Amino acid sequence: MFILRLFVYNVVIFFVFLFIFGFLPNDSGRNPGREE
């Protein structure tokens, strides 16, 4: 039960990191042009 919960948390964190690292390049490409 505990290992299953740990595995689920790992998968969730993995997807969160994937979403952040996948969204950051797009945001960085748009942000500098707007700020400058």
UniProtKB/Swiss-Prot annotation:
Localization per record: Plastid membrane
UniProt KW keywords: Membrane, Photosynthesis, Photosystem II, Plastid, Reaction center, Transmembrane, Transmembrane helix
Cysteine pairs bridged by disulfides in the record: none
Pfam families: PsbI
TM region(s), chain numbering: 6-26
Stretches assigned to coiled coil: none
Entry's Gene Ontology cellular component terms: photosystem II reaction center; plastid membrane; thylakoid membrane
Cell membrane among keywords: no
Subunit details: PSII is composed of 1 copy each of membrane proteins PsbA, PsbB, PsbC, PsbD, PsbE, PsbF, PsbH, PsbI, PsbJ, PsbK, PsbL, PsbM, PsbT, PsbX, PsbY, PsbZ, Psb30/Ycf12, at least 3 peripheral proteins of the oxygen-evolving complex and a large number of cofactors. It forms dimeric complexes.
Protein name, as recorded: Photosystem II reaction center protein I
